[in-house]
Regions:
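...the same signal can extend to comparable exposed beta-sheet modules
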Residues: 1-180
Length: 180
């Protein structure tokens, strides 16, 4: 299984089960994880969409090509630097992309728990995503936050449970496992 370490407990990606023979038995199971990144360009009138998100080490783009652009479904209006999730569907035999905005979570940092690698913002505890953001490992880590950050308002981008992009902390730790 390729990339299983990234799905084990650091993703909320759903598992799809397929009965391709129609006999009531599962023939296949697969996981499609979203790809996260930011918008470089978006202009539907020009069939133009490009992003920092990568698939097989290549930026996902329509290349201003109408046929390529038809493979994208946009759930939201986009502007440069929006944080997005791209879900890929290959069940039709073609690579189809669904692009949606990732809404930020804004709240006060009230707890840093280094042992569990979590922070609590707005009353919810979040771990840190271990997949890719903008084609590289996310820079958001529990080590970025310390006691000097408690009470600070943070902006997080999450998959609902794991942070892949966040406001930087001061990294001025004086120890671990702080609460405010």
């Amino acid at each position: 299984v390729t990339g299983a370490d990234k799905l084990a407990i650091k993703s909320t990606a759903a598992v799809r089960f397929v009965d391709s023979e129609g006999d009531g038995n599962l023939d296949m199971a697969f996981v499609t994880t979203p790809i996260y990144g930011t918008v470089n360009t978006y202009n539907a009138d020009r069939n133009d969409f490009s992003t920092t998100a990568k698939l097989n080490n290549r930026n996902i783009t329509s290349s201003r090509n109408a046929a390529n652009f038809e493979n994208f479904t946009f759930e939201d209006d986009l502007v440069k630097d929006d944080v997005i999730a791209i879900n890929i569907d290959v069940t039709s035999g073609e690579i189809l992309y669904t692009v949606s905005l990732v809404e930020p979570v804004v709240g006060e940092l009230t707890r840093v728990t280094a042992n569990d690698k979590t922070i609590t913002v707005g009353g919810t505890a979040y771990g840190f995503y271990e997949g890719e953001f903008n084609g590289t490992a996310p820079e958001a880590k529990v080590d970025n936050y310390g006691s000097g950050d408690l009470g600070k308002e943070l902006t997080l981008y999450t998959d609902g449970k794991y942070i892949f992009q966040a406001t930087d902390g001061t990294s001025g730790k004086l120890g671990t496992n702080f609460a405010f």
